[in-house]
């Protein structure tokens, strides 16, 4: 069903999710979300906060093939899902130009108990972070909502927050969440199927 939108989405196929970043997984303690508020070691969604400069970091600058853009995000399944999301936004909502995507950011005390903390774990990104509120037309919002449905609640949008930020998209699940793993696998399989079709 998801493959039937725009003709130029066919172009996505060869670039999807054969992620240029290597696949690494990390498993925080089961109570990561609670620990987040105590020691700032985890972002709000339960992923370890990291710094790309660290030798053991799983945050890398990942090319989002097909749209000539890149951003720093967590490699592996997070990259699989978020890169797919960016391409859907590019081809189905509005063209994304180089430099319009922002990924990992260093943790801040102000953001630690908000969805913005997910940027510090490499599990979130912002598309046009400087754009004004209510920049999307109603039909574009409808398409964004359709795109998000395919991720089965694993990806959340800042446009739905009380203090909305339409630029923000983030993983809304912990690393060990079975649905997160299922959705990542679904996206991976679908993308390879697209490559074979074309």
Locate each region found by the language model:
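N-terminal secretory signal peptides and thylakoid transit peptides that target proteins
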Residues: 1-19
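Cleavable N-terminal signal peptides
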Residues: 18-20, 29-30
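C-terminal segment of N-terminal export signals and the immediately downstream linker at the start
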Residues: 25-43
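Active-site acidic/histidine clusters and adjacent loop/turn architecture
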Residues: 39-93
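Stable alpha-helical elements in mature extracytoplasmic
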Residues: 77-85, 123, 140-144
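Sec/Tat-exported extracytoplasmic proteins
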Residues: 85-93, 131, 148-152
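Mid-length scaffold segments of soluble, non-membrane domains
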Residues: 92-97, 103-135
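Catalytic cores and adjacent binding grooves of peptidoglycan-active enzymes
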Residues: 116-122, 134-198
């Amino acid at each position: 069903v998801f493959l039937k939108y725009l003709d130029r989405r066919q172009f996505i196929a060869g670039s999807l999710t054969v992620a240029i970043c290597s696949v690494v997984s990390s498993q925080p303690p089961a109570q990561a979300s609670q620990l987040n508020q105590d020691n700032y070691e985890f972002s709000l969604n339960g992923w370890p906060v990291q710094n790309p400069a660290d030798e053991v970091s799983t945050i890398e600058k990942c090319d989002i093939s097909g749209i000539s853009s890149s951003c720093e995000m967590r490699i592996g399944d997070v990259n699989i899902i978020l890169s797919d999301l960016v391409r859907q936004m590019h081809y189905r909502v509005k063209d994304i130009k180089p430099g319009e995507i922002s990924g990992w950011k260093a943790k801040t005390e102000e953001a630690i108990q908000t969805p913005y903390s997910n940027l510090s774990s490499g599990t979130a990104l912002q598309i046009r972070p400087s754009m004004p509120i209510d920049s999307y037309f109603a039909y574009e919002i409808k398409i964004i909502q359709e795109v998000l449905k395919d991720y089965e609640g694993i990806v959340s949008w800042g446009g739905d927050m009380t203090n909305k930020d339409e630029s923000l998209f983030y993983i809304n699940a912990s690393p060990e969440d079975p649905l997160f793993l299922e959705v990542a696998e679904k996206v991976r399989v679908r993308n390879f199927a697209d490559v074979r079709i074309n």
